[in-house]
Amino acid sequence: MTSPLLELDHVTKRFGRVVIAEDLSFSVGPGDTVGIVGPNGAGKTSLFGLISGDLAPGAGQVSFAGKNVTRLDSAARCRLGIGRTYQVPRPFTDMTVFENALVAAQQGGGLRRKASYAAAASALERTGMAGEANVPAGRLGLLARKRLEIARALATGPQLLLLDEVAGGLTDPEVTVLVEIVRGINAEGVAVVWIEHVVRALTSFVSRMTCLYGGEFIGDGTPAEVFENPRVREVYLGSDTIDTSTVEAVIEEEGTS
């Protein structure tokens, strides 16, 4: 049996009386594709913070590649192989696309000059941004900014890629482009955990989905199994008898609110 690449063991995080994560246990294997859904404020982005090191758990353990990384900060975890994107891409707008990827390779990945240049070039190639390498990032449209955000995470050399709503705000054809980029990254052996309200992006890509609500996991399985889960239906619609297509529509609607 393959050992988990990522493992959260009874992780809890609170801010005062506000529960961010409640006794979460969660694992991801090498090369896995996992989608995470949940209502706004469910704790999805906070979960990524606990995985990436942006947040420290109050209790429990986070392990990555067989190492206890609970007390490591985000920079150390990044260099071990955890790359992530953020909901709102914020590239260095006065730098070129290539320079943005280069900074990520050097500062995030800790790579030296020659290796960092190769990593940056590879990341742009894999995200379809090589042709815009010399374009100032401030001139990019939304899809290109999303691709650059992924490229910056890739430039750090991740074994695990955390995607935080990278399909938000895109048209259907643009979502298709993005999914194919992520599919190619996963085909290289990179595990992907993807938070998303654009359900069609997840259902066309992930093999496993989990639903987070109030800092707790309330459903886990294939996308179909999660959408058919009575608890998930009740959380989204106040009823456990609503059909699956309605649940999917409500999740997407939340992403635009």
What residues fall within each predicted segment?
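Glycine-rich phosphate-binding loops of nucleotide-dependent enzymes
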Residues: 2-257
